[in-house]
């Protein structure tokens, strides 16, 4: 999966954001194991997954603050 764009994340519903976070956490878990066993080819994907999670969480927090 490529880096997520801000506009794409803002278009997601809160449930879709939660699902995306769960999927990214699973992917990150698998990538960490691949790195530990020496099978990981694209090491930059670890950073992208971590940052995608942060992007989604940040936008979700902004949207929650806006609705209050």
UniProtKB/Swiss-Prot annotation:
GO terms for biological process: translation. PROSITE patterns: RIBOSOMAL_L29 (PS00579). Pfam families: Ribosomal_L29 (PF00831). Keywords: Ribonucleoprotein, Ribosomal protein. Gene3D superfamilies: 1.10.287.310. GO terms for cellular component: cytosolic large ribosomal subunit. InterPro entries: Ribosomal_protein_uL29 (IPR050063), Ribosomal_uL29 (IPR001854), Ribosomal_uL29_CS (IPR018254), Ribosomal_uL29_sf (IPR036049). Coiled coil: none annotated. Belongs to the universal ribosomal protein uL29 family. This is Large ribosomal subunit protein uL29. It comes from Bradyrhizobium sp. (strain BTAi1 / ATCC BAA-1182). The lineage of its organism: Bacteria, Pseudomonadati, Pseudomonadota, Alphaproteobacteria, Hyphomicrobiales.
């Amino acid at each position: 999966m490529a880096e997520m764009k801000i506009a794409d994340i803002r278009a997601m519903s809160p449930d879709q954001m939660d699902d995306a976070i769960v999927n990214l956490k699973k992917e990150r878990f698998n990538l960490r194991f691949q790195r530990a066993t020496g099978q990981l080819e694209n090491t930059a994907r670890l950073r992208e997954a971590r940052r995608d999670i942060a992007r989604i969480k940040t936008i979700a927090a902004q949207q929650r603050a806006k609705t209050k």
